[in-house]
Every structure is written in structure tokens, then in C-alpha cells.
Amino acid sequence: MLPAQHKLTSPRQFRRTIKGGRRAGTRTVVVHLRFNDGEDAIAATGPRFGLIVSKAVGNAVVRHRTSRRLRHVCMSLMRDGVKGTMLPANVDIVIRALPASGEATSERLERDIRKALSTWDI
């Protein structure tokens, strides 16, 4: 489970990250990244993550399994960082699961997310 301070909670936070940030995609996920500015950056206690897992991924069981796997990857990213560097505290990341993610393994999801994040210098 992600700690509360590392979650995007409001629709406004999701919208700002998706509309105002950068995007990179793979076969299983699309990753949106946005650096906070102003008050959000001052109050940042670490990177914040949001997940979007729609019905296109599968039935409720598949969606929840996919969400659990994605949350595990987020915890791994907070612990290990990307390419050996820790994620900055002032970054918001939204991970949108594509239909192929319902059949993907945890290792595949982590590899795809790390690949998408490595396209940016963060």
C-alpha cells in the first residue's frame, strides 16, 4: 500500500499531471510525469503517484490485480529510483494501464514503467 503522502488524490491533481506534464508509453502502460511548482513543490514530501486502471483492462479481479502490481512497482520506484537515481520529491506520476497490462507479469510492468521513466532526465 502506498502511504497517503505519496498518492495523488483529487481529480485536479490527476488532470494537472496528465494535461500539463510529459508522456511516454509502452505496450502495457502510459506514464505521465509533471514537476510540481509553487505551493505543491514546497509541501512535497516525496514523489506522488496516481493509477488509472479502466474496464478495458479486464473484469474487476483483473483490474484489482493489475492495480496491486502497479502499486508494488511504485513502491519499488520510491525505494530504488530510476537508473540509480532517486525520484525527486516534487514530481507527480500518473500511470495509465493499457489493456495489455491485464495479462502482463509484475516484472513486465516494472520493466515497462522504468523504460518509460528513463526517457526523461529526472
From Swiss-Prot:
Keywords from UniProt, A to Z, are: Endonuclease, Hydrolase, Nuclease, RNA-binding, tRNA processing
Superkingdom as given in the UniProt entry = Bacteria
The Swiss-Prot or TrEMBL record annotates one GO molecular function as: tRNA binding
E.C. no: 3.1.26.5
Concerning SUPFAM superfamilies, the annotation shows: Ribosomal protein S5 domain 2-like (SSF54211)
The region annotated as signal peptide is none
Recorded catalytic reaction(s): these are: Endonucleolytic cleavage of RNA, removing 5'-extranucleotides from tRNA precursor
Kindly list any coiled-coil regions of this protein: none
Q: Name one GO cellular component term.
A: ribonuclease P complex
Q: Which GO terms describe its biological process?
A: tRNA 5'-leader removal
Q: Give the top-level enzyme category.
A: hydrolase
Please give the PANTHER family that the UniProt record associates with this protein: RIBONUCLEASE P PROTEIN COMPONENT
Primary role: RNaseP catalyzes the removal of the 5'-leader sequence from pre-tRNA to produce the mature 5'-terminus. It can also cleave other RNA substrates such as 4.5S RNA. The protein component plays an auxiliary but essential role in vivo by binding to the 5'-leader sequence and broadening the substrate specificity of the ribozyme.
Q: Which family does it belong to?
A: Belongs to the RnpA family.
Q: Can you state the subunit structure given in the record?
A: Consists of a catalytic RNA component (M1 or rnpB) and a protein subunit.
The entry's protein name is Ribonuclease P protein component
- What organism, scientifically named, is this protein from? Corynebacterium aurimucosum (strain ATCC 700975 / DSM 44827 / CIP 107346 / CN-1) (Corynebacterium nigricans)
What gene makes this protein?
rnpA
